[in-house]
Amino acid sequence: MKKRFPSTLFLFYRRVTIAISLEGILGWGWLGSLLSKVFAFLVACWNRFSWSTPYRARSTVISVGNIVVGGAGKTPTVLWLAEALRLRGYSCGVLSRGYKSQSSRQKKLTVVDSKVHSASYVGDEPLLMAEKLPEGSVWVHKDRRISAARAAEKFGILLLDDGLQYRKLHKDVEIAVVNGQDPLGGRAFFPKGRLRDFPLRLKTVDAIIVNGGGKEAGTVVKRVSNAPQIFVKPTIASVVWTHNGERIPKEALRELRVGVFCGLGFPQGFLNMLREEGIHILGKYLLPDHAAITKKELNYFCQQMAMRQGQGLLCTEKDSVKLPRLSGEVSLLPIAKVEMRLSVNQDDTLSLLNMIEQIHKNRGN
């Protein structure tokens, strides 16, 4: 008889990966300090000696990136920026490397089609962006010069996802996204902290998006960079049941008793947002960033939440595009995805868009 639940060994493996990726177990003690110093040294060498003339695309390239190992909010920022520019009459293409995807490993240029491609083939974030943006907007290739050259034939503006450390492509505008709850990644390189680049890298960007955290986070960032700051706050746009597409009314969220699973670089921000809406979180099942939950894990977590009288499970949109096929799984609790949007000050938005528009016009595009 086929087992419905994951093995003890697999659950132990999940626990270890979470301890490494989210709890920083590798950063403990003298070994963690040593590994962080080695990583910082390698980054410094890379920054100093790895240099080549960047390819200049025919279109304006806007880079959106960060200095930490995940969880800053790049994908929501790219989606917000693409929509804001669309409302100004600009069509935008998105360039992604497709982190850990089959297409990236095959070095194959892929224009993402959300109806055809899977998260394993193109990557979870490119697939999510393809669902949100007009058809043919998201391009995946490990070498962003190749995707930029092709996408420039169709789009006047290209958004380079996770591009802060990518030097092979010329960037007309650089935007850094920082997590307002930990803007400088614990001030230590991974694994002791969350940095993957030096905070002084923020000095060279054109704008900094402070994702949550408010003015206090802005003050911390101001100590290392005078770049203009734009404060954004992630909020719940809607909560949708995945099995029938029905939206849960906003006023009903405070009555929800659910379990939450997610694979994020900084899951605490997502959990805090749910709690602020009054959602009762009965339990959580955390995954490493970009990891997909398995059918056996869903069965296991659903059983736990059913014993606590849970009404269902919640996950992010990024997790929903990686859900396994669940046809015939009648024992599962219903799953709802949380659709988020960024709340941004209109004056800040206007200032950033005006800067981008001026640079775009100066290029003659």
Swiss-Prot record:
GO cellular component: a single term: plasma membrane
Pathway named in the protein's UniProt entry: Glycolipid biosynthesis; lipid IV(A) biosynthesis; lipid IV(A) from (3R)-3-hydroxytetradecanoyl-[acyl-carrier-protein] and UDP-N-acetyl-alpha-D-glucosamine: step 6/6
Residues annotated to bind ATP: 68-75
EC number from the UniProt entry: 2.7.1.130
Catalytic activity: a lipid A disaccharide + ATP = a lipid IVA + ADP + H(+)
GO terms of molecular function: ATP binding; tetraacyldisaccharide 4'-kinase activity
Keyword ATP-binding part of the UniProt annotation: yes
Main enzyme class: transferase
Coiled coil: none
GO biological-process terms attached to the record: lipid A biosynthetic process; lipopolysaccharide core region biosynthetic process
Alphabetically ordered keywords of this record: ATP-binding, Kinase, Lipid A biosynthesis, Lipid biosynthesis, Lipid metabolism, Nucleotide-binding, Transferase
Pfam family for this entry, one: LpxK
Keyword DNA repair: no
InterPro entries the UniProt entry points to: LpxK, P-loop_NTPase
PANTHER family associated with the record: TETRAACYLDISACCHARIDE 4'-KINASE, TETRAACYLDISACCHARIDE 4'-KINASE, MITOCHONDRIAL-RELATED
Family: Belongs to the LpxK family.
Chain's role: Transfers the gamma-phosphate of ATP to the 4'-position of a tetraacyldisaccharide 1-phosphate intermediate (termed DS-1-P) to form tetraacyldisaccharide 1,4'-bis-phosphate (lipid IVA).
Protein name: Tetraacyldisaccharide 4'-kinase
Species for this entry: Chlamydia pneumoniae
Chain's gene name: lpxK
